Each structure stands twice: as structure tokens, then as C-alpha cells.
Amino acid sequence: PNPYLVSVNPAAAELLHIDHTEWTRPEFAEYFSGAKLLPGSDPIAMLYSGHQFGHYVPQLGDGRAIMLGEVRTNNGERWELQLKGAGLTRFSRDGDGRAVMRSTIREYLCGEAMHGLGIPTTRSLCIVAGEEVVWRETPEPGAMLLRMAPTHVRFGSFEVFYYRRQHEYLKTLADYVIQYHYPHLVGSENAY
């Protein structure tokens, strides 16, 4: 409730062609906290599998992040917008789906530092907070991080369908990734 903007990353906003005058509008915090949906948005939590603590886990998924949607810029770039700390999803398992301010700030700063060092990573658009208190060892202020990347598809996105033997979904996902991120492979004999 009552979302407000904690910080905006001007460099990331520029990638989306967001004018700095937009940051001061109340709607900015409402849209990028998930309180209001962006036009055409249909938020989802992504399913994936992978390894944790040395063991394969057949189903993980975004336990506290939702994909708000995708922005296509005037120069043809695609950016997926993901809100971390958004609350429970169908993949939350035992957690509450929330994030606290300290970990949100840490991820914001570390991600941008990695980018500055030339290491490919998600970019941080903004931190949004509200009145919610999140319980960890002690009560802490809650916050959400709006992350952006050309895609949030990961290796585990493919693994989950491979190990479930859902080859038609695996092919659909591969075709999507090829079409939008490796278009030079479309129609290639060795596209996969």
C-alpha cells in the first residue's frame, strides 16, 4: 500500500527512454510496484528448475518475483521488467515472497557495479517501497526492486521441460529465444 520511489537509476531509465520528469509522477511508483498494471501487462512468475546445494531440484521458479511485461524501445531493443520482492507466487514454497530494504539496496548496487565492470547482469531500474513491514530476524522495512534484462529466461527454464520430457514446450521456448534473441539462427539447419 502507498508505494513510493526510493531510488531511480538514470542510466537504466535512459535505456527504456523514460524521461526524468516521469519519476516524480505518483503513477511511476504505482506501476513499478505492481500496484497498477502497465497497459497490456499480464504479470507472470516464471517456472524453472536447477541445482541447489549440490542437488537437482525439479521445480523451482520465481518465488518472490513477477514479470510485469516487456518494453520494446524505439530502437528495437527488448527489455523484460521483473519486480523482485512482489509477494507470494505459485512458486514461493515456504517464503513470504517479500524482500527487505537492505537486501534490495545490496542487489541494486551490486548489479550496477557488475554492469560497470563489464559483467553481463540484470540492470536495476528502481527501488520502490511502501508501508509494509517484513519479518525476518526482526521487523524490517519492505522494498521491491524493478530489474530489467533482455530476457529472464535462464538455463533452468529449459531444464524443467527437458527433465519432465515435455519436448513440445522445450521446442516452443527454444523457438521463442531464437526468434527474439538470436534471429540470425531462424531457419538455420543447426538452430538448436
Range-by-range predicted roles:
Residues T104, V134-Y192:
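ATP-dependent phospho-/nucleotidyl transfer catalytic cores
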Residues P1-I105, L109-S157:
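Broad phosphate/nucleotide-binding scaffolds in NTP-utilizing and phosphate-metabolizing enzymes
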